[in-house]
Amino acid sequence: MAEQHDMFDDIIEISKGVDALKNPFGGITDALLGTVDESKPHWNPADYKERPRVNCIPCLACKSEKSSCHACMDVCPVSVIEIEDGAIDVLDSCRKCGLCVAACPTEAFVSPRLQPKKVYDAVARAATAHETAYVTCTRALKRIPRENEVLVACVGDVTRETWFSILTDFPNVSVYLPLDICANCRNTCGEEMLGEAISEAEEWAGRGMGLEVEPRDLKCNKRREYERKEFMDKIVRQTGLTVSKLTPATAAVASVTQRIREHSSRVSALEKTLNSACGVTTQKRRRILTQGRQLMLSTLQQHPELAENVRVQFPEFDHDRCTMCGACVEACPTFACDLLDGGKLAIEPTYCIGCGLCAEVCSDHALKMVERDGSELVVPDPEAERKAKLAAEAKAEYAEAKAEVKQKLGRALDQIEKLAD
């Protein structure tokens, strides 16, 4: 059923028309006089690209010569990444495409624009306030992005964990990628990385990602409830009236900022839960939770039913072959491996990123990588458990009170029948 058009919608449409009439010939005048408004943003693809910084500490190739990982060098379109003597060097001829950031399993390459949480928040802002949000690259868009368009240097810059969280929380997100736009692009691995990341995320989330290939199909329509809330907030600022008195439905809509803040709070609470439960090894080393894993764990915490769809790599331990040399513990970039006092190797699945370095450095071949589902990645939510417990107690109290009232009512009716006789 279509949403009923009311007085507030009419007022919003009128206000849009008034705003457009304030300076109707401004653009024509500027064009004739050659005036350039410096305050307005200008299209420059370089503004959406940045050279990644490098952290050699978690790099698998830097930690051990036995590592077979060279994912960053494999995806680099101009071969500017060099790893030698435990150090990573990015040459000045870097294209700033960001593919190395997405390819690195340990997040040794850092780009503030491409951090999984920042990408998620950018998509959340666009998808929460608009009917459809789009993720695209500078080569495809070739203009300043609108409010519902999230622009990255290359479409392959978004990881599978980020896509998984986006697909689960926002079904109204699509990728804009014109046909053959990647054919002549120098970022040769970008389209392939996008396909692999989205295909895995779609399997995990159990739903498909939208795709747009025509520029004319890109729409920028705000969701009705958020447009109304935006208008009501403007009235509050100008008149001081309470929004709930004007329209309670609008007051109940959570703002974009509030939704992002709630997600950040969930991620922080999840990290605190893990830190208190298993955040430190027996050698007093603090385990490291990558940003991509944070997003995945947060999504699985809210949607545990999706855990069976998730496929991840975990090391499997053979106690008979292990000599307790500790090589795997020293090599693990996130300190997920731990040698316990009883002579047993323990691997914390929530921190393990499945890089396989522990299996590669084990000279006794006591470790091998196997594929499992994500059931071990579901972290209990203490707040949700507390609320569920309170709800169960309230339900039990209600049932008890209902039974007591029913019993008293039955006795009263019996007394009335006796008096009638």
Residue ranges and their predicted role:
Residues C56, D92, P349-T350:
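Short, well-ordered coil/turn residues that connect adjacent beta-strands
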Residues M1-V75, H130-T138, L218-E225, D233-T323, ...:
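Ferredoxin-type iron-sulfur electron-transfer modules and their immediate structural context
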Residues M1-A2, N172, P178-Y226, Q407, ...:
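N-terminal secretory signal peptides
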